[in-house]
Structures are given as C-alpha cells and as structure tokens.
C-alpha cells in the first residue's frame, strides 16, 4: 500500500512555489479483490493517516423503471424508505447516475458483426446502422446511462474485532507489546487479513442484503477490474492499464499482486490530457469543462410518491440534457442531536411568538417554524430517521461558453422553493468528493453544506429512477423519455416477440431491422408473408436485395412435399430423435386438419376427431418404421434436389396406403374405426388430386437451405385452401428451423391462420415448446383480437414475453386493455395522432412491453433500410425507378436513401 507523496517545493528561477500532488487529494491506497464462493467482489481501499481505513464497494444497479403501474408505487417507495432507515451509523451510500452521448459500445458490437458477415449486402446495412448510431450520438439523442452505488465500510485497525471500549483498549495494548517484541509485521499482516474478512462479512454482505432484499433493487457487485476501468475512464480515453497493486483475499488467505511500484493515482495520470486543471468556475479534464451545481434550498415537497421518486429523473431525462452526472450521498445523522436541534427551534419559535404577542403583533415565521419543528419531531418519534443528503450535479461541455449556457438552463429546471446554484469558489473540491476514491463525505468539508432530510423525504433526492436498458445485445430502440438505448435480444437467448401496429405504424421497418440483425449473427430466418394483390410484400424487395442469402418462394407455384423430413445430419443423435419426433407431431396435426378441417365455429365430433387422431398416429408410426420408406428418404437426400431419387422421395400418396387395418395390424375393426379409416382415405385422396393438394403431395421443387426463406401465401381461393397452403409453408419453415440449432420463425399478418384451430394450435405449441428446438417465434398483427379468439391464445400470449406495440387505431384500445391487460392510460397513448411515425427525425414510436415492464421508445431506422423495406405504393414506385436507373443495387438504394432524406 502506497504512502502519501507529500507537498514539494519547486524553484523556478528565483521564485519558489509549493505544490500539492493530486495523489494526496485522493485517498486510494490499493484495489481489493475478494473471491469467495465463486464470486469476485472488488473494492477500493482508502487510507487517511496511518491507521484509518475505509473500504468502498461498488454495485452496478438496474434502478427503478421510470414507468410504473399504480399498484407498484407504494411498495417500491416503502422499500426504498425502509432501506434508508437501515443505513449503518458512520457509513454512507453514494448513488451515481450518469447520462452521456456516447456510442463506443454499440459501435464495437456492430463492428464485430461487420467482421463476421461475408455478405456485401448485409455489410452495407450494418455500416448504414453504424452511421445512424453515430448521427444520433452527435445530435444528443442517444444517451446511454449508468447507475452505480458505492457503499462504505469504515474500520479503525487499532480496534478491529473489538466490540466495546475495554476491548479496544486491550487491542491497542496488544499492538504496543508486539511492536516491542518484534512481532508487529506479522501481526499487521494478520490484522489486515482480519480487516478485509470483516469488511466482506460485516460490510459487503450487509450492504448487498440491504440493497437487494430490503430496498428491492437489482444490483450486481462490480469486480476489481471493472472498478479500476471505471476509475481509469474518469481521467483517460485510452486502453486501460493493468492494476498497479491488487490485494487478493480468498479461501487461501491474503496476498498482494504488484504490477507497478507507482502510486495507483499516479498511474491514472497517464498524460497531460489526464491531469485535471482547476478553476473557480470549472474543472478541465479529458478535454471537457466540468461545471458543478448544488442545492442551496430544498424542494418544497411533492404531490405524491411517484412524482417524488421521479423528481431528479424528470430533469436529467430532458431531451436537451446530456453529458450530465448526478451524485447523491446519504449518511445517517445523529438522531439525538437532531431532536435537540428541533426542540431548540421550537423553543425559539415559542419565544418569538410570545414576544410578538407582547408587542400586539403576530410572528408568522415563528408559527411556521414551530409547526415544522413539531411535525419533524413527530415523524422521528413515529420511526422516521434523519439523514444527511448531499447532492451535486456535474455538467460536461467542450467549451466554457457552452458550459455557462448549460448551467443556466439546468438551474432553470428547478422550481422555487428549490434552488440550485452553480459552485463558483471551489468546484474542484466538490468534483473530487464526487469521485469514489476520496475519503471526505460529499459536501461535508470544508463546510457542511449537506441538507437534513427525514427518511420519508430523502427518496425524492435519490437518482434511482432510470429507463431499464433491456438486454445487453440485440436490435436497438431509443427510449422516448431520456434517450436511453433499449435493446431486445432474441438472438443470443430464447425469446418470442409480438409486433402489433396498424397500417403505416412502421412495422415493416422494425421487422426488417429484426431480420437483418438475425442474419448478421448467423441465425436462419423463415418468414410466412402475405403479399398484396400485385405480388409485392414487406419482404419481397428485401429478399431480392439479399440475393445470395435469401430465397423467395411463391407457395402456389412451387411444390412442397409435406412428407419431406428435415435434414438433421448436422445435429447430435439425441437431438435428431427429439426433433424428428417434433416434425412427426406436426405431420399428425397437419393430417388431422386435412381430414377433419375444424374451422373455428364449426361443430366437430370430439370422439370422432380423437379416433382419427389415433389412427393417423398409428399410421405415421408404421410409415416411418418401414425400412423401404427409410431407404427412399436416404437415397433422396444423397441424390439431392432434382435427382431421380429425389423424385422418388415418399409423399402423401405413399402414406395413404398405410391407413388400413392390415398396415395398422388390427386383428378386428369396429364400425366406427372402419368409418374413420374410410374418411381418412377419402379426404387424403381428395387433397392428392386437388390443385392445392398436388403441391403438397409432390416432391419439393426448391431446396430450403438459404439463410432467409420467405414463403409468399397468395392466390388462395377459399379459406380451406388457405389453411392447407399455410400448413405447407409451415412444414417447410419447420423443416428449416429444426435443421438448425437456433432459428427465427416470423409469421407476418396472419389473421387467416388463426381461423383454423389445428393451425393455431400448431403455432401455440411452437410458442410454448419452441425453446427446446431453439425456435424463436415472431408474430406480426394489427391487433390481438384474432389471436385471442383462437383456442391456443393462452399458449401464444403467455409465451410472447416481449411485445412491441406501435400506433394503433382508437377502436383497438379496448382490445389491448381487455386481452393483454394494458392500463388504458398507457395504451391510450398509442392511439393518439402524435404516435404516428415522424418524418422529421425519421423515427417510429413504440411501446415496449418486456415481461410487464412498459417503455415508450423510438425506432430510428437507417436510411438504406428505409429505402429497402418501406412498402407504401409511392415508396415502392420510387424504389423500382431507382433500380431501373442504377443497375448496381447498392448504389440504387443509396441514391433512394438520399432522396428520402431530402424529402
């Protein structure tokens, strides 16, 4: 552990100047890593003097989401208030919320995707998104936020392990004796080991329980490497250096890892760029000027608990506020001293009132002070705890003039009696106290400028509210309130997605972005698409643009053998059997639909349907157990698409022969069973001979190995044909999905599918059980009505863990409120005229429902993506004209994107 540098005198010419090293203004002695039970917990070790130590733990916190349901508010507020009451005397909790317009993390993620993608077209789209992200950063729209909590554990080494005054004296005597007999170094080592063990059990574990269990916050203890990197980024923009000195405490004991003998604070000052420069109005560090603002007067109060918790969030979430930090430190005040002070104020007020009465006057201020003093004492006696709260606002700007303007605007956001003023004497001192490596409490020295609050008031000054950032990776939206990037990841983890929105809500653009990201990470995507009468659809031009990675099939002109099994040769044998069973289950449902039909609303004999299902199940078992059938499948896959063996692949026509009591090995057959078998044969022969059925019963004419498969369902004459063609497309999609470890199955605008019980049950089963096959389901619809009427609605809605709702029709508000249980005050915003996509700014608006957490967000598409997927008639015409003018499709899309931007 490094000692203080000390002041030095430097003589320049004839003049001598005394300097105080920056290292001595901060008290970081070493970094600590505590490794127990498979966990790595980091901490800063601060030292003041020779025997005073403070250990500071850091937690990364999700925070309290800025959109809460009414029933959540009271419980969350009570949890925060209860946690504040349990802060240990002598310790402090620091809450650090930062909002900066940066994009380095997202750019790195997209850059990694760019490097792993081979397709020129996909690379073009990824680069377009990188450009859009950089544009949003420069405009101050994209503002990632972080929320960190710092908790202290203060210890006097001379009395560590002592619980009362006598034990403390004995510990000090023992220390003196060991120094006398030469055992002090060993004792000192054991003492530090004991201090750090106590810090873990009596400090870290208590704080973690307080934050997560008592206050209900989602926290993660930061590691030593993360804490060092965070400290490094306060002063530098370069690659972080190795930790100079690290104390490691684990089950084997205490050891020190040293990579440099330099003071860790000296290592932080990597260059002149890193060294802070102080002024009476600002601190200059990392090329930015930092202004400091503090509270001079407390807020007058809040209308309700929700507004109280949102008090600071409503300031930092303003669109014009960026590159800003809020640092709040809470420490427990001495309750007895506060009571005495309140009693003194009350006595002074009573005396002032008596004096004014003697002079035949009324002292209104004395009456107010008396009332407030009595109310404060009542609250304390009823269980409130007095707390010292220090709050500082740090604004970062590139020039002093911009900083002056930003500080004036920031001050104007606080309404009287709250008074926020810019620090004009020693901002460097407060800035240092905001760092996690200084000993002094925030705003406690050189003058105690902290405000005294009761535990019921303090939550209004805690910056715990922010927009939850969602997943670590995935496609990205920007929260409407605060500009926080919110990501949805259905690529690296299993998640089903629902997209709801009326026509012109921007669904096509968002769907295109979802699919682009999936293709970039290597996931195969299968889409069931419903084209317009002219044959165009959401994904028709998109598939043409991605020519080598995509295949677009018109299911009415292609043959799709429903009995073609998925090619599972690349999967483990155990997984092959499981997925083959899944496909046979699908075949059973498909055949049942072909035989029974069962359009919703039509009456069916349940007993007869069960009998048909049983017979079909036995027939399928016999069919796939036949060695000759297996050999034909093997030869077909060996020969490949279009070969003679491929044309001999088993089809529906071959299966009909297995629907007999001889094949089923039935010794005797009842009348009902005989009738069911005849019904099965009749219906299946009908499908084999029909126009639609011929496409199902012939060998497939396409190979579904493209990464993006789009099946267009069009030219359907009636609902029954539509159902069977949908089953055909579903079978091809399922084969493609089952042949991959993970895949996406996208059903676009599918109201007709849910009109048929068998098909809706298939989709419901896929939503409920698709996780084991790695299939992520995406459903796109204008409203939830059609899905809700299907028999599988419960399975579907319960497994659509994430839903994105765009602009909806006013008449659809009731559906979302009734079916999806959305609060009307939340979903009502989606029906407003203001929720339509904005041409100015080029974004669409969405409500993200992530497992019941609501976030209003904006989707900012890149202009090339807009040029490719926009599907209103004017945009489609402009796209076709661009392709006609420019044969190079990338140049054509770039030209169209520029034209759209100009308009």
Question: Each PLM stretch: what is its role?
Answer:
Residues 1-452:
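Extended, folded cores of ATP/NTP-driven motor/assembly subunits in large transport
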Residues 19-52, 465-503, 510, 689-715:
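The Walker A/P-loop phosphate-binding site
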Residues 55, 147, 524, 707, ...:
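The start of beta-strands in P-loop NTPase/AAA+ ATPase cores
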Residues 60, 64-70, 96-123, 137-140, ...:
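Switch/coupling segment of Walker-type NTPase motor domains
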Residues 61-63, 99, 153-157, 397, ...:
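Short, flexible loop/turn elements at secondary-structure junctions
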Residues 73-88, 333-336, 431-486, 540-546, ...:
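P-loop NTPase motor domains
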Residues 352-354, 482-485, 490-505, 509-517, ...:
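Conserved P-loop NTPase motor cores
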Residues 497, 572-638, 789-903:
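P-loop NTPase motor core of the ASCE superfamily
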């Amino acid at each position: 552990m490094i000692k203080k540098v000390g002041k030095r005198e430097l003589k320049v010419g004839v003049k001598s100047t005394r300097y105080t090293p920056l290292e001595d203004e901060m008290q970081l002695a070493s970094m600590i890593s505590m490794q127990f039970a498979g966990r790595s917990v980091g901490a800063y070790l601060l030292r003041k003097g020779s025997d005073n130590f403070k250990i500071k733990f850091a937690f990364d916190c999700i925070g309290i989401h800025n959109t809460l349901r009414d029933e959540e508010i009271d419980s969350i507020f009570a949890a925060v208030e209860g946690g504040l009451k349990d802060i240990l005397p002598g310790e402090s909790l620091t809450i650090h919320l930062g909002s900066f317009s940066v994009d380095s993390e997202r750019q790195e993620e997209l850059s990694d995707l760019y490097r792993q993608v081979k397709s020129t077209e996909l690379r073009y789209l990824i680069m377009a998104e990188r450009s859009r992200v950089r544009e949003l950063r420069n405009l101050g729209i994209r503002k990632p936020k972080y929320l960190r909590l710092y908790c202290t554990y203060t210890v006097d080494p001379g009395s560590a392990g002592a619980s009362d005054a006598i034990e403390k004296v004995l510990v000090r005597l023992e220390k003196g004796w060991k120094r006398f007999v030469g055992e002090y170094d060993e004792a000192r080592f054991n003492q530090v080991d004991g201090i750090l063990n106590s810090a873990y059990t009596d400090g870290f574990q208590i704080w973690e329980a307080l934050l997560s269990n008592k206050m209900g916050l989602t926290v993660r203890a930061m590691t030593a490497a993360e804490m060092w990197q965070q400290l490094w980024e306060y002063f530098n923009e370069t690659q972080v250096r190795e930790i100079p000195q690290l104390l490691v405490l684990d089950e084997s004991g205490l050891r020190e890892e040293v990579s440099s003998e330099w003071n860790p604070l000296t290592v932080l000052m990597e260059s002149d760029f890193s060294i802070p420069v102080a002024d009476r109005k600002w601190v200059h560090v990392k090329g930015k000027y930092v202004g400091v603002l503090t509270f001079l007067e407390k807020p007058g109060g809040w209308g309700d608990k929700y507004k109280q918790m949102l008090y600071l969030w409503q300031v930092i979430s303003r669109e014009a506020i960026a590159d800003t930090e809020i640092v709040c430190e809470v420490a427990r005040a001495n309750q007895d001293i506060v009571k005495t002070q309140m009693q003194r104020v009350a006595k002074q007020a009573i005396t002032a009132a008596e004096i004014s009465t003697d002079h035949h006057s009324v002292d209104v201020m004395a009456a107010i002070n008396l009332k407030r003093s009595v109310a404060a004492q009542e609250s304390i006696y009823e269980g409130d705890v007095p707390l010292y709260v220090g709050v500082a606002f740090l604004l970062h700007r590139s020039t002093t003039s911009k900083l002056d303007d930003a500080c004036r605007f920031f001050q104007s956001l606080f309404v009287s009696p709250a008074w926020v003023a810019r620090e004009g004497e020693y901002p460097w001192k407060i800035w240092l106290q905001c760092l996690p490596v200084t000993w002094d409490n925030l705003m406690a020295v050189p003058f105690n400028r902290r405000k005294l609050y009761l535990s019921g008031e303090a939550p209004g000054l805690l910056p715990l509210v922010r927009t939850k950032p969602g997943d670590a990776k995935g496609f990205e939206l920007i929260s409407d309130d605060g500009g926080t990037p919110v990501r949805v990841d259905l690529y690296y983890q299993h998640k089903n997605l629902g997209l709801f929105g009326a026509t012109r809500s921007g669904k096509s653009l968002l769907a295109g972005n979802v699919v682009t990201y999936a293709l970039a990470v290597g996931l195969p995507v299968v889409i069931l698409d419903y084209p317009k009468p002219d044959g165009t659809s959401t994904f028709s031009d998109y598939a043409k643009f991605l020519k080598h990675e995509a295949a677009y099939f018109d299911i009415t002109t292609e043959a799709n053998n429903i009995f073609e099994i998925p090619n599972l040769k690349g999967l483990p044998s155990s997984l092959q059997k499981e997925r083959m069973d899944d496909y046979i289950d699908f075949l059973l449902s498909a055949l049942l639909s072909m035989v029974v039909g069962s359009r919703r609303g039509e009456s069916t004999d349940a007993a007869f349907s069960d009998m048909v299902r049983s017979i079909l199940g036995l027939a399928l078992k016999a069919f796939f157990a036949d060695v000759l059938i297996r050999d034909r499948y093997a030869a077909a896959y060996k020969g490949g698409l279009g070969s003679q063996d491929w044309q001999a692949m088993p089809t529906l026509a071959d299966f009909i022969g297995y629907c007999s009591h001889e094949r089923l090995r039935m010794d005797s057959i009842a009348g009902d069973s005989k009738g069911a078998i005849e019904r099965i044969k009749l219906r299946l022969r009908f499908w084999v001979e029909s126009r639609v059925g011929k496409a199902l019963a012939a060998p497939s004419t396409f190979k579904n190995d493209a990464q993006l498969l789009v099946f267009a369902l069009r030219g359907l004459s009636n609902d029954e044909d539509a159902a069977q063609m949908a089953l055909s497309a579903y079978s091809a999609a399922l084969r493609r999905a089952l042949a991959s470890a993970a895949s996406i199955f996208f059903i676009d605008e599918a109201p007709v599918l849910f009109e048929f019980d068998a098909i809706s049950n298939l989709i419901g089963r896929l939503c409920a059980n698709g996780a084991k096959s790695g299939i992520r389901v995406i459903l796109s619809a204008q409203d939830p009505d059609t899905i809700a009427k299907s028999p599988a609605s419960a399975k579907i809605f319960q497994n659509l863990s994430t839903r994105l709702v765009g602009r909806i029709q006013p008449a659809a508000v009731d559906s979302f409120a009734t079916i999806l249980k959305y609060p009307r005050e939340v979903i009502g915003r989606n029906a407003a005229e203001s929720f339509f996509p904005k041409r100015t700014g080029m974004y669409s608006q969405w409500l993200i429902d992530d497992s019941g957490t609501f976030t209003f967000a904006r989707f900012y598409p890149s202009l090339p993506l807009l040029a490719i997927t926009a599907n209103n008639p004017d945009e489609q015409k402009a796209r076709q004209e661009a392709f006609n003018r420019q044969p190079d499709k990338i140049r054509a899309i770039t030209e169209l994107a520029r034209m759209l931007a100009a308009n």
